[in-house]
Design a protein with these regions (language model features):
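Broad gene-expression machinery/nucleic-acid interaction feature
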Residues: 73, 233, 359
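Short low-polarity hydrophobic stretches
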Residues: 76-79, 236, 373
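N-terminal cysteine/histidine-rich coordination modules
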Residues: 2-124
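Charged linear interaction tracts used for macromolecular binding and regulation
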Residues: 112-317
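Residues that cap or initiate secondary-structure elements
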Residues: 58, 82, 124, 242, ...
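Nucleic-acid endo/exonuclease domains
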Residues: 207-210, 214-229, 246-426
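A structural signal for short, well-ordered beta-strand segments and their strand-loop junctions
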Residues: 53, 234-236, 348, 406
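Intrinsic-disorder/low-complexity linker and hinge segments
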Residues: 103-107, 131-140, 318-327
């Protein structure tokens, strides 16, 4: 039933047979290419779904059939990925293992076609003249344990990262990604995320090199927004820190920015950014990769002006490793490098807008069960209290039958021996 493992350490994700739900036709891994496969997906697209046969219980786990341009492919079906075999390519931890648990159905819901519908804190359509903007609390001021009816801009970036599976690393990952690769992956997911009556891709600006296809697409999105009056969203890496240009931060400078308006930021937004993302800004100044998501309103264009300018309405930052895995600290970065070096498969659970939830720094995906790993690098009373809560949580052997792993910097300066993957103990 399963396709052969192809990695150097035997921990690769597997391909399993796929059944087309409405016809019952089964395609083993060896037949999941070619004309018959593509024809079957095209006929099934929008009318049914696939079933992954990764478990020997005769109950296929649903998978989505999606279209990208002229191509069709099979992808995870939302809220069911945790029911797959741990080594299945469609497996992912459940919403309860990330910050997605912190939203109501008003904030995020699954459409009948498998797409997502979300409601943002700040709408893409500007309020009518005289109508007030909603007052948004900074990320650290959110009420604890309160499920939210809207998604913040940072939550949207976490959602896109998760849906594109950029927060997951497999031991057979073929190569490092570029900013343009990441932009393409985000665009693919934006096409299936609905905000009001439109999909996100219609207002999304992404990293682009001059004169390339992405540059032209960005320009078209900006031109369309000038006609419609919609607000835009840009995602991209912060440009390398320049102490002369960036110390006062009058503008948000993105890397690979072609087609993106010049982003001017006012004092109030700048103060909020520095308060909420001090660690990320510090890492940026140290040369680390930091991605930004920016919601903007285009400024009127003066006659004879060729440069588009926009006012930054909101901005959130995300710290990343060289492999674009999200990180919350420099110690997580050290651990992430070690996991990659050791040939492990893992995922980084995204917090979204649910900062008080208990979930680990990473989940190991090669243990055949939920296996949390943590790095503890602080010693404040508040941090120690949270660490105690996590220790109690992970002691539950029903949830975590193989236990958990941690690296406490105050106990061990070097990373302790990692647990062996399931394949080595078999």
């Amino acid at each position: 039933m399963a396709g052969p493992a192809t990695t150097k350490d035997g921990c690769a994700v597997h391909k399993y047979s796929i059944k087309i739900a409405n016809t019952g036709k089964i395609f083993p891994p060896s037949e999941q290419s070619g004309k018959a496969w593509i024809d079957a997906l095209e006929k099934a697209h929008r009318s049914t779904h696939g079933q992954c046969m990764c478990l020997d219980d005769d109950h296929g786990r649903p998978v989505s059939i999606r279209r990208l341009g002229e191509n069709f492919y099979v992808a995870r079906f939302r809220d069911t990925s945790h029911h797959h075999h741990k080594k299945c390519r469609f497996y992912a931890p459940s919403n309860e293992q990330s910050g997605m648990q912190g939203y109501t159905r008003q904030a995020v819901q699954i459409r009948e076609d498998g797409d997502l519908a979300i409601r943002l804190d700040r709408a893409l359509t500007p309020p009518r003249a005289g109508a007030p903007e909603p007052v948004l609390a900074p990320p650290q001021d959110r009420a604890a344990r309160q499920r939210r009816n809207t998604m913040s801009l940072g939550g949207l970036l976490d959602l896109l990262w998760t849906e594109a599976e950029l927060n997951t690393w497999h031991s057979d990952q073929p190569r490092k990604l570029s900013d343009q690769d990441v932009g393409g992956a985000l665009l693919q997911q934006a096409r299936r995320i609905h905000v009001g009556r439109r999909t996100l891709d219609g207002v999304l600006l992404l990293p682009a090199r001059k004169g390339e296809e992405e540059h032209d697409r960005n320009k078209e999105v900006v031109s369309s927004a000038r006609r419609s009056g919609l607000r835009l969203v840009a995602i991209g890496p912060l440009a390398y820190f320049d102490p002369v240009r960036d110390n006062d931060m009058p503008y948000v400078r993105l890397g690979a920015p072609f087609g993106v308006p010049k982003l001017q930021i006012d004092e109030a937004t700048r103060v909020a950014l520095r308060r909420s993302y001090a660690d990320e800004l510090g890492a940026w100044q140290d040369g680390k990769k930091i991605y930004a998501i920016v919601q903007m309103a285009l400024c009127p264009k003066s006659p004879g002006t060729f440069v588009d300018t926009a006012d930054v309405l909101a901005i959130s930052l995300l710290r990343l490793s060289e492999r674009f895995i999200p990180l919350d600290s420099s110690y997580e970065g050290i651990l992430e490098k070690q996991l990659v070096k050791a040939g492990r498969s893992f995922t980084k659970p995204m917090r979204f807008d649910h900062n008080d939830a208990v979930f680990p720094d990473f989940w190991l995906l090669d243990m055949e069960c939920d296996y949390p790993i943590e790095v503890f690098g602080m010693n404040t009373p508040e941090y120690q209290q949270r660490k105690a809560v996590k220790r109690t949580h992970y002691a539950n052997r029903q949830k975590y039958p193989k236990g958990w792993w941690y690296w406490d910097l105050f106990e061990h300066k070097e990373i302790p021996l990692l647990p062996s993957p399931a394949s080595e103990r078999a």
